[in-house]
A protein has these predicted regions:
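Extended, hydrophobic alpha-helical segments in both membrane/secreted and soluble proteins
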Residues: 87-91, 101, 143
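Nucleotide/phosphate-binding catalytic cleft detector across ATP-hydrolyzing
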Residues: 1-81, 86, 98, 135-136, ...
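Short glycine-rich, Thr/Ser-proximal phosphate-binding strand/loop in the N-terminal lobe
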Residues: 95-133
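Active-site-proximal loop/short-helix segments
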Residues: 109, 169-172
Length: 228
């Protein structure tokens, strides 16, 4: 986007200036929303880039949500896909504009020390502090370093990841989100959720743009996950 620069005669705020430029640039865009992360960096970014910037975000039902603004006009927009298995975790990074695979990596699941199968891990997370321990094992000890490896390989920073998709079994989904999975192993075997929408990287502590949506592949049973 190339924005008009403010003058003494044109004192429109930066946010409104960007919103008007974005509405003019995208067909079907009827409303523009800027995330807090974007607004915080907007003034400095616009002036350092002489008001010529690249934006990243989502356009849904006419509403453009701007998740980032940068003066680097060739900055890539990246998506991340992760398969969480009980033993192995695999991830890929994709260029969201071209579909190109830009990085791939695998690692062991950090939860393995708490049990080789989901039942033993549910038992472990049922102990005091267990939910947090199991979540940290998959998130902080596995996904964070795995994503760092992929970002280094792709030559990007994690804040260029604007969407992440995760597939795993029902128990792994609960443990990743820090949700008690004990009801899954107790008759009548009812999980807290099969699918969860609206979660961001900031909510979860996932290494990405803070407003990147984390998409969970929906599960279809207590022991049948979205990774089948």
């Amino acid at each position: 986007l190339e924005l008009s620069e403010p003058t003494l005669d044109d004192t429109m705020p930066d946010t409104e200036r960007l919103e008007l430029a974005a509405q003019a640039a995208f067909d079907g865009c009827t409303e523009v929303k800027l995330t807090y992360h974007t607004v915080k960096k907007l003034a400095k970014t616009l002036r350092e880039a002489n008001f010529k910037v690249q934006i990243a975000g989502t356009l849904d039902m006419g509403v453009l949500t701007v998740m980032d603004v940068t003066g680097k006009l060739d900055a890539p927009m990246i998506g991340c896909a992760i398969d969480i298995g009980t033993t192995t975790v695999t991830g890929v990074l994709l260029n969201l504009e071209t579909g190109e695979l830009v990085a791939k990596a695998s690692s062991g699941n950090g939860q393995i020390r708490y049990g080789a199968d989901v039942i033993n891990r549910i038992i472990e997370q049922s102990k005091p502090g267990g939910v947090k321990r199991l979540q940290d094992a998959i998130l902080k000890e596995t996904l964070v370093p795995l994503t760092a490896v992929m970002c280094k390989s792709a030559g990007i920073t994690a804040d260029r990841i604007f969407r992440a998709s995760v597939a795993s079994n029902t128990t792994m989904n609960h443990l990743l989100l820090g949700v008690d999975a004990n009801p899954v192993r107790m008759e009548p075997y009812i999980p807290t959720f099969f699918q969860w929408r609206g979660m961001t990287a900031k909510d979860l502590g996932f290494p990405a743009n803070p407003d990147a949506e984390i998409l969970l592949a929906p599960n279809i049973g207590s022991y049948v996950g979205g990774d089948i």
